[in-house]
Amino acid sequence: FLAGMAAGFVTGILHTFFGIPGILASILTQIGLYSVNLGIMGKSNQAVNVMQYKLVASLRYVTGEGSELFFVKLIVAALILIAIIYWFFGTELGASIRATGCNPQMASAQGINTGFTKVLALMISNGLVGLSGGIYAQYQGAADVNMGRGAIVIGLAAVIISEVIFAKFCAGRKAAFAFTLGAIFIGAIIYYIVIALVLWLKMPSDYMKLFSAVVVACF
């Protein structure tokens, strides 16, 4: 989580302090982190000894004994994370970040330091991405420098699917933001169900990226 926050801080500084466009700043950070990951791992891929370490998530927890308890813990952790995010974005600082994202010019006119809120938002989001990457590496039992490719497609798919399915349900409700956060998790689950269905139908795995794009386009 802290490593991800550091990456977000670098991206934010490149964008706000040096004036580099947001997309380019994120690409530059990603390119730099590729070499950093290689330096830390020593090679392009590294196995995680599941018997030596007590892991947060592992494939053996899903397929072995006590898998039901693991799924319960996973759901509880997701709900706690949603609650924390909802609480934070309801605070003055969180509202400032949301205002900056909606309309940075108006937020700046209201006296909000948009440079600070952008950096903070990038640090939080990248911290969550880093935490997710660490958990995913534990689950897979290995880490690879290329394993994060395509993650943006999954994230966008989760957001788009949740918006299409739950937009009318969340509109106008008092806790619409909380419902939206929960809907994103459900959207990600629906996306993976569709992908699992594609695999179950024994369609060529070489076209998995194409199937993913079609799923997002359909929604």
Give the ranges of each region predicted by the language model:
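Helix-loop-helix "hairpin" substructures at the membrane interface of multi-pass membrane proteins
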Residues: 1, 7, 67-148, 152
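Membrane-embedded helix boundary and interhelical linker motif in transport proteins
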Residues: 1-17, 41, 60, 64, ...
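Alpha-helical transmembrane segments within multi-pass membrane transporters and channels
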Residues: 1-31, 36, 78-82, 186-187, ...
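Structural signal for membrane-spanning alpha-helices in multi-pass inner-membrane proteins
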Residues: 12, 37-38, 81-89, 133-137, ...
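Helix-loop interface residues and adjacent transmembrane-helix termini in multi-pass membrane transporters
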Residues: 17-20, 116, 178, 200-202
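Transmembrane helix-bundle core of multi-pass membrane transporters
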Residues: 22, 26-90, 144-145, 207
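Transmembrane alpha-helical segments in multi-pass inner-membrane proteins
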Residues: 129-210
